[in-house]
Amino acid sequence: QIALTVEGEFIDESVAAETEQVLKNLEAVLGAAGCSLACVLKTTIFLTDMNDFAEVNDVYARAMGKHRPARATVEVAGLPRGARVEIECVATAAACREGKSSL
């Protein structure tokens, strides 16, 4: 997911704003499948500048709360639409149904 709204608007005021939108998008996709961020097993964060890591990490940590899925962060040469951050995740509905929030 990158920082596109449902209307297709790209949010690019700051890397924090991008990250917030990306996480909202992930929550929406997970919600449509009957899941939440608590169902996430692993995330991969793609950054175009590793200097943005601390700011992205702050937003990510607030969104995830006490849940701490496995995570990798990778610096990349570029992302679609000039995005500075993209996050992909692997989730399982079984973890949510069983009341488990992490491995």
Show the residue positions of the predicted features:
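Short, polar/acidic, helix-capping and beta-turn segments at strand->helix junctions
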Residues: Q1-L103
